Amino acid sequence: MKTTIDMQVLYVTCTVLAALILGYIQAMIIYRLWFHPLSKYPGPWLARISNLYSAYYAWSGDLHIDMWRCHQKYGDFVRYAPNRLLVNTNTGLKAIYGFNKHVQKSTTYNVMVHRAPSSLTMTDPQESAQRRRIVGQGFSSTAINQYESIIMEHVQRLATQLVRRGSDRGSGWSAAQNMSDWGNHFSFDVISDIVFGARHETIGKPDNRYVLGCIDGANIRTSVLFQAAELTFGRVDRYLFPKSIESRNRFTPFVSSLVRTRLQSHDASRNDAFSLLVRAKDPETSEGLSMDAIGGECTTLVMAGSDITSTVIASTLFYLSTHTESYDRVKSELQQAFPTADDVRLGHRLNSCRYLRACIEESLRLSPPVGGAPWRRVVSDGLLVDGQSIPAGCDVGTSVYALHHNSAYFKAPFVFRPSRWLTDSGAQGRESRDIRLAQSAFAPFSIGPRSCLGKGMAYAELTLVLATLLSKYDMRAAEGPMRGIGGGRVGAPWGRHRENEFQLTGHVTSAKTGPYVEFKKS
């Protein structure tokens, strides 16, 4: 008898709880669809009620593509999550990421913090400004010039490896090379050397290449949590992403060992970034960085610094190998600037290679390494964007990929056209206006007080390696089945179908493959 009563009580209790939960979910859906402050903005219906919509596309690596698709369907303002709004205008870019006291980094950046926050993840504007004053000293013009010899050493090592194995045709051309892989190895070697003075030599040795896979693997989980931090409740993410956590647990000790080794060397005279961070003081407060803070900054530098450069190396070579006219113009420009490839160095002659720089800019526009929307939280009195009042407490952002392909700012937005960044002598005023308009919507390194600190070093590294390789070798796209790898595919989902567009899979950093190209000594 007692057992029967207990079962009845349990049944009633479960029924009531289920009804309450169901009622709560229904009320939440009704509120988010019709009464939420962002309810007037269009967007996918699932995105309007749940963060899981954007989390899914983050997991798939298609987040930037879907954001672009949504703008094509719904317009410049898209509700991309219950409490998040996408804005696809140049004025929105400036309002959200410029010097504006009404916004700060979203708390979703907390999912990226491990032990100590870095200049990338800090949400408080004052704390971030102080950290950037210190860390920025490691990326000043003076510091970059000190890193040049390190970069060039790895450039020469890469150049040697690219032609080490010839093709089967015996024509003087190398075997087809996957430039995503080579770019990853080169960029990781450079940033490890610059930050820690560590020589991993993944260009020539496979021993430490596993670290690159760990970075990509760990970032799958991070990219999902950046969209749906609630998946950390009850440690649900541990069950959803066991391989990502395994990758993180391999990568974190690797970086920690680099920090320990560098500290134990007791060599404060080195000019690597680690030494500069140890010595650097905030010019306003004279405060330095703790070891945990330095470790956090170094981890960010290794992950972000290697990814951006490797992605742009691959994308630029993809576009040049498929656009003969642009390739020939770059070759001619470099031949005029440098008698031999050994003469390539930072300075006036490299700066004069305007078409090379335009090719890099156009590759960054078409295939930005970070194509999603870095979310910002609206604070205080709200934010006014293009006449739209966005209330405090909401997240707002601009998809870099979507903005870079907005025809309001870029004519023929999916066409590789480096000349769009150049003003020829005697150009008319309209051409100059077109360039200014394009520049107003160009943000591969973001803009404003939270823009990328390593932008100057990235451009230095990119111009040095691309100028050297294109001066030293002739290059062509691989023939046969490897031709076109890296581009879109006819019949693929909308946004992935363009064969002439270098495709990226976005998981905080960018996974990619190709292009396959062949080299021959000039």
From Swiss-Prot:
Keyword Oxidoreductase: yes
Principal subcellular localization: membrane
CDD domains: CYP67-like (cd11061)
GO cellular component: membrane
Pathway: Mycotoxin biosynthesis
Transmembrane portions of the chain: 10-30
InterPro entries: Cyt_P450, Cyt_P450_CS, Cyt_P450_E_grp-I, Cyt_P450_sf, Cytochrome_P450_monoxygenase
Subcellular location: Membrane
E.C. number(s) listed in UniProt: 1.-.-.-
Source taxon at top rank: Eukaryota
Record flagged with keyword Iron: yes
UniProt-listed SUPFAM superfamilies: Cytochrome P450
Pfam assignment, any one: p450
UniProtKB keywords: Heme, Iron, Membrane, Metal-binding, Monooxygenase, Oxidoreductase, Transmembrane, Transmembrane helix
Listed GO MF terms: heme binding; iron ion binding; monooxygenase activity; oxidoreductase activity, acting on paired donors, with incorporation or reduction of molecular oxygen
Amino-acid positions noted as binding heme in the UniProt annotation, renumbered to this chain: 452
Consequences of knocking out this gene: Increases the production of AK-toxin I and does not affect the virulence to Japanese pear leaves.
UniProt membrane topology term: Single-pass membrane protein
Essential cofactor(s): heme
Protein family according to the UniProt entry: Belongs to the cytochrome P450 family.
Annotated PANTHER family: CYTOCHROME P450, CYTOCHROME P450 MONOOXYGENASE ATNE-RELATED
Other facts noted in the record for this chain: Gene clusters encoding host-selective toxins (HSTs) are localized on conditionally dispensable chromosomes (CDCs), also called supernumerary chromosomes, where they are present in multiple copies. The CDCs are not essential for saprophytic growth but controls host-selective pathogenicity.
Its job: Cytochrome P450 monooxygenase; part of the gene clusters that mediate the biosynthesis of the host-selective toxins (HSTs) AK-toxins responsible for Japanese pear black spot disease by the Japanese pear pathotype. AK-toxins are esters of 9,10-epoxy 8-hydroxy 9-methyldecatrienoic acid (EDA). On cellular level, AK-toxins affect plasma membrane of susceptible cells and cause a sudden increase in loss of K(+) after a few minutes of toxin treatment.
Protein's name according to its UniProt entry: Cytochrome P450 monooxygenase AKT7
Organism listed in the record: Alternaria alternata (Alternaria rot fungus)
Originating gene: AKT7
